[in-house]
């Protein structure tokens, strides 16, 4: 499956991403709980999720209010996020991925601000980054992205409307798009749009560039669409809602980058930690294969599959974590892929309805693979004392029985 980000009329904002992800099916209560855990450490916030019509279309509006307008240094924010994670979610894989993505988004904002103001990261106080509502926007959007398993799918973005005119800031009246927005979107196709006002925030733009795989001028060839609308605050003469389209791609191939390096100096414990680190940093798959190296020394070949946009970042992680001085890069590898879908299904287990996520693979509308999410199976197994292998077999059978007509 693919995700298409459509900000052709609405522009981009962090709370619009949250609303659109919830509209697509992300669990709003889980998102609110995670947002409050992090954002309340930066200042008191209040979150309200409601349905609102925009241009006659019912949308989900994520309203985030805070009375705290303090600013913080970039390094302070990163350290605080890590401290909160260690305190509340030290072993939660989805949270660890969320925080890694969030830190990338913060870094994008920090670099843009530093270039605009001509200061180093250590010297900057962040007006956009430091506030609790910006922390809420970034954490909430990143967490929802992983809740929907969108990191495993290709993300397209259509040209982004930036708005036009001028905007009043604490530095004076500036043209739209604002300098930080223009800097973040420097490699992104943009249009002015139909309105004479600012409709792109730096936070929304930073989220976009960190999750998009490819920028396209029109919708790709897709079927079986699910649509989510995230409402903006302003009432405009055009649709002020970010549209996210989750769909099956008719294209049967994908492109990825393969990274390889040979290692003979790491212990088994370090290799195990490296495996988890690479996945949490955005790798799609990691394999570690024993081999014999120069002078008959035993070693390992570490192979990583990642999105093209993540290749440089993952390369840096490999070098930092292993000490290797070289990584082989095999770019734009084409792979044949089945149409894939991530769905939620209610399964009756011993008289109780349990929510189980499935990864479904299709060829010509025929199910060729049906795999329940291990974390869900493990949770149910702990609750029911049913062996995991028996649970997997049972829920797969129940899914196929319940979906024979699909």
From Swiss-Prot:
GO terms for molecular function: lyase activity; nickel cation binding. It comes from the Archaea. The keyword Protein biosynthesis does not apply. Keywords: Nickel. Belongs to the LarC family. This is Putative nickel insertion protein.
